Design a protein with these regions (language model features):
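Short acidic capping loops at alpha-helix termini that bridge into adjacent secondary structure
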Residues: 21, 43, 76, 94-95, ...
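Acidic, glycine-centered active-site loop in nucleotide-sugar glycosyltransferases
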Residues: 110, 115-118
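Conserved beta-to-alpha transition
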Residues: 109-110, 124
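Flexible, glycine/small-residue-enriched loop-and-beta-strand segment within the central core
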Residues: 8-13, 26-92, 117-119, 123-134, ...
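Beta-rich strand-turn-strand
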Residues: 82-106, 112
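Membrane-anchoring hydrophobic helices of lipid-metabolizing enzymes
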Residues: 1-21
Length: 141
């Protein structure tokens, strides 16, 4: 299923990713190629240009000859900004906006905006529409 020339979802579903309805994923976004079945994306979520979502980690077990395989969850009505990186095993709640370039290495609760490297919560109480727009900004943390 090709949404348009800039967004592709069906390809990732064929690879085994669990992707909800009305999602848009940039063609340049990278969804884990080694363990695509470990990536779960909720309805109405946007994954923007060159964002990366991982569900495996070779570095932790490289010396012992094994890799870590885990599931990475992204909730409903989320936006993953350009060049953001979601690390393996992270759970991102619903209505979360991940700023461009953020590196998310810990789970994030619902209704937040996260930014930075490592990512931290900068706003709570946000609401994101099903079109990926921030409806309520919430309060600064």
């Amino acid at each position: 299923m090709l949404i348009n020339k800039k967004f592709i979802v069906g390809y990732h579903r064929l690879r085994g990713c669990d992707i909800g309805e009305n999602c848009k994923i940039s063609k340049s976004a990278i969804i884990d190629r080694a363990h695509p079945k470990g990536v779960h994306i909720g309805d109405n979520t946007r994954v923007l240009i060159e964002a990366m979502i991982l569900a495996h980690d070779y570095s932790r077990g490289a010396l012992e000859g094994y890799s870590m395989w885990c599931d990475t969850y992204i909730g409903k009505n989320c936006v993953i900004g350009g060049r953001a990186m979601i690390m393996p095993g992270v759970k991102i709640g619903d209505h979360v906006y991940v700023a461009g370039g953020a590196v998310v290495s810990r789970s994030v609760p619902d209704h937040c905006i996260v930014a930075g490297n490592p990512a931290r919560i900068v706003r709570k109480g946000t609401v994101i529409s099903d079109k990926g727009q921030i409806v309520e900004k919430g309060e600064r943390v």
